[in-house]
Amino acid sequence: VSHDHYDHLDYGTVRALAKTGVPFVTSLGVGAHLEAFGVPAGLITELDWWEHHTLPGGELAVTAAPSQHFSGRGLKDRNATLWSSMVIRTAKHSVFFSGDTGLTTEYGLIRERLGPFDLVMLEVGAFHPSWGDIHLGPDNALEAHALLGGGAFLPVHWGTFSLAMHAWDEPAETLLARAPERGVQLVMPRLGEPVEPVQAERVTPWWRSAGSLHAGDTVVTEAEALSVPKVAGWPLD
């Protein structure tokens, strides 16, 4: 769990996972939320940046790394807990997960200390030009991917929660158009679909049919163009 915002730390999801007895690895301070949600303290490991934890069995290790974001679930706990990116490593493979973040030069340091990566998972949705310090968006995600040294690119944090004013599929369409120019291998399965990155086929824009709602003979397209102001309100997550 990268940080404590509601779209990353969901009560119902945590409660369901807690019943399975799986271990939780998270950022400093977030463990208190997990305990309050019913996770036994013995199953929670909190990490500061650059700390790592090897899960039971010894085959999977998680390292917390820097990200550029913030935390808080209410009006009085702003930045009371840490936010992180995560590197998940086995003997054969290494995966980078950005959590929520703006574009940061720390990615170069992460590459030096923890890379290279077979798969890079970067947040691309819920973005706005005035939020660049805390959210990547598709263009900055491509820059972050380069700083991290490449690897297959699995875009995350898009198409689910409506947290910004752009069309829900804009991140996907932007990446589909611009990633080939940079020689980036995109991995874009349907939401929730298992995928093996090495065997991933050419991206098909499945979201184009998912974005239309049919009401009788009328097609109502959700991804309408919106008039986005130059400055948008500060996001809550």
Residue locations for each model-derived region?
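Alpha-helix capping/helix-boundary segments
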Residues: Y6, V30-G31, E51
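Active-site metal-binding motif and surrounding structural segment of the metallo-beta-lactamase
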Residues: V1-T26, G115-M121
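Cap/insert and terminal regions of metallo-dependent hydrolase folds
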Residues: P23-A32, S94, G102-L191
